[in-house]
């Protein structure tokens, strides 16, 4: 019940919803969501948290007298498609149970699809090209996933959305190029026998910029 809807399938849904006028608002909310927020404010409140798999059954078991299965399913479907909820998933926040305890990390595929959908919605409201920001977020999601570049690219590849595939490829290429630069800088630093401050000055870098690049390279080495 908590699987996030892929951005590719939501494009047509969103366009259809936009044409239904007053029905749109009704579909974006459900009276049961207010009740869920009272019962579990840490999950359904102003700052939603990713829900554990099986939360539907947990809610029915805990609130059997108050909940109807069909209404709960409708409410959860609306909730897990909301931008606030998808933003939490896109951040890679852990999935939580009804007690608010973190129980598992979202799957890399869910994080990636949430990123695409959140940025698609933001781009519709913004004149700014959000592509560069999305590519950076995809790169960060890849690096946090623990997958190799090829495995991540294969897992996130869409059979229908070539625009998303192009964005994915560009993000991974940019990230790989930056990682290569960081690694080269770290090797040069290690061979220089200089302090980080002196090394940054020698290369014309701001000390904080050099420190961040060296830290990224060390972190990347630790993953290999």
Residue ranges, per PLM feature:
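N-terminal, leucine/charged-rich tether regions that mediate assembly and partner docking
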Residues: 2-73, 77, 81, 86-95, ...
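Residues within the helices of the helix-turn-helix
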Residues: 57, 186, 197
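Short alpha-helical "recognition helix" segments of helix-turn-helix
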Residues: 59, 152, 198-201
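Short, basic interhelical loop/turn and adjoining N-cap
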Residues: 65-69, 197-216
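Short, Lys/Arg-enriched anionic-surface-contact patches
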Residues: 71, 157-181
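General nucleic-acid-binding
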Residues: 98-154
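Short, amphipathic alpha-helical "recognition" segments used to contact nucleic acids or chromatin
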Residues: 176-193
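Short, solvent-exposed alpha-helical "recognition" segments
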Residues: 178, 211-224
């Amino acid at each position: 019940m908590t699987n996030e809807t892929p951005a590719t399938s939501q494009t047509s849904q969103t366009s259809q919803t936009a044409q239904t006028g007053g029905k749109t608002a009704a579909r974006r909310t459900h009276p049961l969501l207010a009740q869920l927020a009272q019962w579990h404010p840490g999950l359904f409140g102003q700052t939603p948290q990713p829900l554990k798999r099986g939360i539907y059954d947990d809610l029915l078991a805990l609130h059997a007298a108050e909940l109807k299965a069909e209404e709960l399913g409708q409410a959860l479907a609306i909730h897990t498609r909301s931008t606030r909820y998808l933003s939490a998933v896109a951040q890679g926040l852990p999935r939580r149970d009804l007690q608010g305890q973190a129980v598992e990390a979202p799957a890399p595929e869910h994080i990636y699809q949430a990123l695409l959908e959140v940025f698609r919605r933001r781009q519709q409201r913004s004149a700014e090209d959000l592509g560069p920001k999305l590519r950076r977020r995809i790169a960060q999601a890849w690096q946090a996933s623990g997958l190799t570049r090829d495995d991540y690219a294969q897992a996130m590849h869409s059979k229908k959305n070539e625009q998303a595939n192009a964005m994915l490829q560009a993000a991974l290429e940019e990230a790989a190029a930056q990682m290569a630069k960081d690694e080269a800088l770290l090797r040069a630093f290690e061979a220089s026998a200089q302090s980080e401050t002196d090394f940054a000055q020698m290369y014309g870098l701001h000390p904080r910029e050099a420190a961040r690049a060296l830290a990224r390279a060390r972190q990347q080495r630790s993953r290999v």
